[in-house]
């Protein structure tokens, strides 16, 4: 016995294979890279990848739209990666505590998490807020992303500033996320 909803979910997954493979491959690559270099940072590493993907998915790029078979489906995955990001960040915040890095790095990280959590709350309250106000508040996530990048690079230091697979992966996702965020905020 199959319902319409089950059929729609199957249709989403069957038509969106390229897009879903892109997301899954990004997470697998992230997991494998962090497992082989600094396994204790896998959770925040996945959070960075997820946040970067969230920005990339919000760009409305025609390529992504074709991979997911429609903008609506791209935004469904965008919401999922945003939610996954905040869950991973909260888990990271509780599991790492104040164990690593400087006090300033920790403050950047905490501030970023508070901004992310606030914006997720605003996103879910969006239907009660005028669209223009919601859109500008939602853009503050870019500030949180930048603070999070400062946090990461202050904590990881030389591991991310020397050329290796980890620095290439983190740098690539960070740069793609920054470029996507800039594009979203300033160019459309």
Identify the role of each PLM range.
Residues 2-6:
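Extreme N-terminal basic, low-complexity initiation segments
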Residues 7-188:
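Membrane-embedded alpha-helical bundles that constitute the cytochrome b-like, heme-associated redox core
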